[in-house]
């Protein structure tokens, strides 16, 4: 996939450039693992597997409303996703939507899977659905921006990535995604804009080092 190859090339600078995440939910995973690699920490895996088992037991025997059942499917889907079990995650997300059709966070995950499959039209429709349900869903600006980037609609990508950046101008990863798109859209201005935006970054964020790398420092 072009998206995968692109992220791998970035990982030569940082294995977690995508750590800013593509997913926004109550317990945001997960975001670092969505597109790159599932976490390899054994203790974390064990805890996640225990939670998956417990949720499965509750779903089998528990009496609950559709909303509660949808929430459990979503939470188990997030756990599967964090383990790299995307087929199982997708099943749970689909179940959640069948029970609770207005879960914006589920559409965001499904949109990411479609993006990875290079089904850009369907991914765009799914990300648009997120905004219809929750206009404040921040990370979908990144996801939809990436979708536009890969179909070379850089002007539309700029709109989304700029909104994503403006939501937190101290986040180096937001600065980087905006810069990468501007290299395509307005290459004469991209470097100067990166220099200016880098001034607002905190040295407390490791990702600031990646920005400095792009600046040649």
Which residues fall in each region the model found?
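Register position in tetratricopeptide repeats
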Residues: 82, 116-117, 150-151, 184
């Amino acid at each position: 996939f072009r998206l995968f190859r692109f992220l791998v090339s970035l990982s030569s600078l940082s294995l977690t450039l995508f750590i800013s995440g593509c997913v926004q939910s109550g317990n945001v995973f997960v975001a670092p693992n969505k597109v790159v690699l599932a976490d390899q920490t054994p203790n974390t895996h064990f805890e996640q597997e225990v939670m998956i088992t417990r949720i499965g037991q509750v779903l089998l025997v528990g009496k609950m409303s559709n909303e509660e059942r949808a929430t459990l499917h979503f939470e188990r889907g997030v756990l599967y996703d964090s383990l790299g079990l995307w087929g199982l995650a997708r099943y749970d997300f689909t179940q959640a939507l069948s029970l609770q059709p207005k879960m914006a966070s589920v559409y965001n995950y499904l949109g990411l899977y479609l993006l990875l499959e290079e089904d850009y039209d369907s991914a765009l429709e799914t990300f648009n659905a997120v905004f219809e349900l929750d206009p404040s869903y921040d990370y979908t600006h990144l996801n939809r921006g990436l979708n536009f980037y890969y179909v070379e609609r850089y002007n539309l990508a700029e709109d989304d990535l700029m909104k994503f950046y403006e939501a937190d101008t101290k986040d180096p990863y937001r600065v980087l995604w905006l810069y990468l798109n501007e290299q395509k859209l307005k290459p004469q201005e991209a470097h100067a804009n990166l220099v200016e935006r880098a001034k607002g970054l905190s040295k407390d964020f490791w990702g600031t080092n990646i920005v400095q790398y792009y600046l040649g420092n």
